[in-house]
Curated annotation (Swiss-Prot):
Signal peptide residues on this chain, from the entry's feature table: none
Protein name: WD repeat-containing protein 89
Lineage of origin: Eukaryota, Metazoa, Chordata, Craniata, Vertebrata
Annotated WD repeat ranges: 21-65, 68-107, 112-156, 168-208, 214-254, 319-358
Keyword Repeat on entry: yes
SUPFAM superfamilies assigned: WD40 repeat-like
Classification via SMART domains: WD40
GO biological process, one term: corpus callosum development
Organism domain of life: Eukaryota
PANTHER family to which the protein is assigned, alphabetical: WD REPEAT-CONTAINING PROTEIN 89
Keywords annotated in UniProt: Repeat, WD repeat
Amino acid sequence: MEKIEEQFANLHIVKCSLGTKEPTYLLGIDTSKTVQAGKENLVAVLCSNGSIRIYDKERLNVLREFSGYPGLLNGVRFANSCDSVYSACTDGTVKCWDARVAREKPVQLFKGYPSNIFISFDINCNDHIICAGTEKVDDDALLVFWDARMNSQNLSTTKDSLGAYSETHSDDVTQVRFHPSNPNMVVSGSSDGLVNVFDINIDNEEDALVTTCNSISSVSCIGWSGKGYKQIYCMTHDEGFYWWDLNHLDTDEPVTRLNIQDVREVVNMKEDALDYLIGGLYHEKTDTLHVIGGTNKGRIHLMNCSMSGLTHVTSLQGGHAATVRSFCWNVQDDSLLTGGEDAQLLLWKPGAIEKTFTKKESMKIASSVHQRVRVHSNDSYKRRKKQ
């Protein structure tokens, strides 16, 4: 079996999205899980103007656009069993659209509590439950839950929540991620540095909390990995990386597999630079965890993850001209979608003929929007380098 590092090194750009009337940072990418003959494969992209664009994957042309106006959308996720696309909104709702229909209004609206500002969310693997995380308001930072299923007895498009967890985070809930195959397991990350694992099949919040891990810094990304997805990894806004093994919760073995306060200081990039982390990539077939990072000039780095540390394996270049914000790896055809601050969505495929195009420079975006996108912290890194 070809290793993912070989697949990654063999990627070439086959398509670049066309320019849009309003260039934006591309902050999140997800692809439709339903593939049908005769139907185009859909890609949903979260944009820094608070909207979601739907693209045809092969041509990368914009098919339609959904807005959360007057709120801003945070996160983007396709359902697992249909072409519904979801996003959390700062107006206190989670919205759901039919990605194949150009309709402004959501087909479903999941309402939170009056003061909720949702900044993270996910839907579980059987499409039954949605969980969204809020900004801290007063002393509350919540995880709010809904039943996502359509009810033939109640055709209302608006749904109230099932309830909320309120005791386990003390600051903004920046990340929510359900287990890939267990619909009852969910992990949340927060600006308070805590990463909490819950079994939502258990009635009350205190008993549902399986374990708490501490990254000691604001959480920017979390995910599941390992055989049976019994490990979790975490990245922080100051480029830290943490990896925990839940198999060891009831043993004498340490739960922490890896603890790196600042990846930029420890990974040997040889002649290159590593400016930030983008996300993690667990390859189920090879049981390997990889970390994706990049440079401010658009180069993308693949790093192998083991208990001895992170190792730079290979890099992609010649695509983006600025910070890369998002990626989506397709296991079926080993293709990669990337997006970033140059407003370009790129499709990479293995062994393809390289497409040439003119690079776009990074854009300046409004400060109000900039507050809602991930800002990589260089301050602590620069301070330590001076010491």
